[in-house]
Amino acid sequence: DAKLAESPQELEAFLRVFVEAGVDCLHCSQRRFWEAEFEAVDGMDGLNLAGWAKKLTGLPTITVGSVGLSTEFTGAFRGESSKTRPLTDVIERLERGEFDMVGVGRALLQDPFWAQKIFAGNFEDLSDYDAAALKTLY
C-alpha cells in the first residue's frame, strides 16, 4: 500500500514543510481510515495517518478513507460496491481526540442525506455503496 512515510520521523520531516509554510489544518487521506499508519510502532490499533499528523505537528487534522464503508475507494472505479461499516470506531477515535474532523466521500455520493441520518442517529437507514452512484446527480 502507498504511504507518505515509512516511520514517524519521516512523516514529521515531510509535514514540517507544510507547518513552516503556515498550513493550519491537515487533511489526511488514506484508503482505510481505521488502519494504523505505523503498526510496527504502536500496534494494529495505533494512530492512523491523521492521528500521527496531529501528534507530530499539533495541528488539527481531518481523517478520511472509506468512512462508513467496508472497502477502499479504488474498487468504485472497477464498478465494485461496498457494504456499510459501523461508525463506532470513527466516533470513538474522534471523541478521544485522535483527529478533529472526519471527511466522507462515497457514502455521501450514495446518499446525499447521509449526514442528516447520522445526526438523527438513524444508522440503520444507511445504504451500501453502489458504484452507479458515481454517475448519479442529485
Language-model-detected regions and their locations in the chain:
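Flavin-dependent oxidoreductase catalytic cores
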Residues: 1-138
